[in-house]
Amino acid sequence: MFKNLDAEQARHGFTNLDMAQKLGISRVSYESKKKSGKFTTFEAKNLCRLFNCKFDYLFATEEDRR
């Protein structure tokens, strides 16, 4: 769903398990949230801090790019 999130995760060499641990959730929960796009505000802020990226970039969707 979020190609930039996927790209940053890959660029930093983080697995889904790594990401889940950084957010304090299970790997299955992280994968579900990534697929559905339903991160909490707290989780989204933490991901932006982790990758030093703005929210609009990290969570851009295909629809946003049109």
Could you describe each region identified by the protein language model?
Residues 1-14, 18:
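A short, Lys/Arg-rich alpha-helix, primarily the initiator
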Residues 24-39:
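Recognition helix of helix-turn-helix/homeodomain-like DNA-binding domains
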Residues 43-57:
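DNA major-groove recognition helix of helix-turn-helix/homeodomain DNA-binding modules
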Residues 6, 31-32, 59:
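Key DNA-contacting residues within the recognition helix of helix-turn-helix
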Residues 10, 21, 49:
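Alpha-helical residues within the helix-turn-helix
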